[in-house]
């Protein structure tokens, strides 16, 4: 049995890398581990809002992290302090066979019941993705196969993916549904090789009615895993079984992804999700407040929504922080209280607020050009390289989709943005002057204002 403190430190490091500073301070730093047994990890959180968020967004990552660290399959149990009860002595059970521990591909795959279409707030940034996901859920395997949903962190890709699974299961309880992250798939494949059970692995993955694979971009540097997934994909596609994939970028932008996989991922429909606009952010907060029975004025919701522009996770994290601050001070939630609660997050400094026009202005000023030069069609070197740098910075420092970046930088095609990003990345490895310019511009943009 692994040391609980060491395991928790490992999970903390993973969350610190994957979450924004706002998310990490709100959800992870306020939680603490209570007990670890062979099949259960108890985690204490301060309030019911934290519990709901953990159960909706973080338990799957805990399961993956514990398996990576200790090769244990556990069910995370999230409890508030009031709910926490001493675990009965009968929780201690004999260790399972080593072979059984390795058969991760035989473990049940749990869809989060809270990820439904009813709980999804539709806005301009996700309405096409929502419509496509709903169409797939209502008639799996017949249209948009595969469905490829891409966009930044915390924008609802996993929610939509699991909503498809939950609706399919609701319509057909006998449906065989498999939800995994790309890391799960890779680990299962490796374990099947080590235990000489590749045939069982293939039976598990190639006989499903619906395969949901999250964060497919992590396949990029795994050649053998890509080979296995290629054959899995082909089998399911030929049998008209539905495949849904998510990624933080388009298929042809994933580094080291085989061309034949890119081609297959592009067979269906690719839809993006972008950061929610103000109206959608307010609706998300109202939906969350109503679900948690929180009394909060509309003007306060508007204030919070105006402070958090990055993603839904940070938005919900801000609401939880305000609710906790209200409880601690024993005061009603007001705009003034919300401002005090969010002050420590230094929201005015976060890079998530950076816009493409700000990048264009900074790049134009730096290279003594005009914004119109960058948006124009002139192909002289003195303009082309700054234009490519602007596209590179927009891709690296904002959550905007490739089509959005291209549109705002002179109506360019998304493939032009991909080329510019790759060109600047490659050039920085050999051109020290260019690298210094990009670093200096990054610092200017980070320290703007």
Swiss-Prot record:
Task: Locate the region Domain II.
Answer: 72-109
Q: Which Pfam families match?
A: Bac_DnaA, Bac_DnaA_C
**Cell compartments where the protein resides:** Cytoplasm
- What keywords were assigned to this record? ATP-binding, Cytoplasm, DNA replication, DNA-binding, Lipid-binding, Nucleotide-binding
- Binding site residues for ATP: 154, 156-158
Region named Domain III, AAA+ region = 110-326
* Known function: Plays an essential role in the initiation and regulation of chromosomal replication. ATP-DnaA binds to the origin of replication (oriC) to initiate formation of the DNA replication initiation complex once per cell cycle. Binds the DnaA box (a 9 base pair repeat at the origin) and separates the double-stranded (ds)DNA. Forms a right-handed helical filament on oriC DNA; dsDNA binds to the exterior of the filament while single-stranded (ss)DNA is stabiized in the filament's interior.
Protein name per Swiss-Prot or TrEMBL: Chromosomal replication initiator protein DnaA
């Amino acid at each position: 049995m692994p040391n609980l403190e060491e395991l928790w430190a490992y999970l903390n490091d993973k969350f610190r890398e994957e979450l924004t500073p706002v998310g990490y301070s709100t959800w992870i730093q306020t939680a603490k581990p209570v007990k670890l047994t062979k099949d259960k990890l108890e985690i204490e959180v301060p309030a019911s809002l934290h519990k709901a968020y953990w159960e909706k967004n973080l338990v799957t990552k805990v399961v993956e992290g514990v398996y990576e660290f200790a090769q244990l399959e556990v069910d995370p149990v999230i409890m508030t302090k009031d709910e926490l009860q001493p675990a009965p002595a009968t929780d201690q059970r004999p260790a399972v066979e080593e072979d059984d521990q390795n058969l991760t591909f035989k473990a049940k795959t749990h869809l989060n019941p809270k990820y439904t279409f009813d709980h999804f707030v539709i806005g301009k940034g996700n309405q096409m993705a929502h419509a496509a996901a709903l169409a797939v859920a209502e008639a799996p395997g017949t249209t948009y196969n595969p469905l490829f949903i891409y966009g930044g962190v915390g924008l609802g890709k996993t929610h939509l993916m699991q909503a498809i699974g939950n609706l399919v299961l609701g319509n057909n309880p006998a449906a065989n549904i498999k939800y995994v992250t790309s890391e799960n798939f890779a680990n299962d494949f490796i374990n099947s090789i080590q235990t000489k059970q590749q045939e069982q692995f293939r039976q598990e993955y190639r006989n499903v009615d619906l395969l949901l694979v999250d964060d497919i971009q992590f396949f990029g540097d795994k050649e053998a895993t890509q080979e296995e997934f290629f054959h899995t994909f082909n089998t399911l596609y030929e049998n008209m079984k539905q495949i849904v994939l998510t990624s933080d970028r388009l298929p042809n932008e994933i580094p080291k992804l085989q061309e034949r996989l890119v081609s297959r991922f592009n067979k269906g429909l690719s839809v993006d999700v972008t950061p929610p606009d103000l109206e959608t952010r307010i609706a998300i907060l109202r939906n969350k407040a109503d679900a948690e029975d929180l009394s909060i004025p509309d003007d306060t919701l508007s204030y919070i929504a105006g402070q958090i522009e990055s993603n839904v996770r940070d938005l919900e994290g801000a609401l939880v922080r305000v609710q906790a601050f209200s409880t601690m001070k024993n005061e009603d939630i007001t705009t003034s209280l919300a401002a005090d609660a969010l002050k420590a997050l230094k929201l005015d400094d976060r890079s998530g607020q950076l816009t493409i026009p700000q990048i264009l202005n900074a790049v134009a000023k730096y290279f003594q050009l005009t914004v119109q030069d960058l948006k124009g069609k002139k192909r002289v070197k003195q303009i082309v390289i700054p234009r490519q740098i602007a596209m590179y910075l927009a891709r690296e420092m904002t959550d905007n989709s490739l089509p959005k970046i291209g549109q705002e930088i002179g109506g360019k095609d998304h493939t032009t943005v991909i080329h510019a990003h790759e060109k600047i990345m490659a050039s920085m490895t050999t051109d020290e002057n260019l690298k210094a310019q990009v670093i200096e511009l990054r610092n200017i943009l980070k320290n703007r204002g």
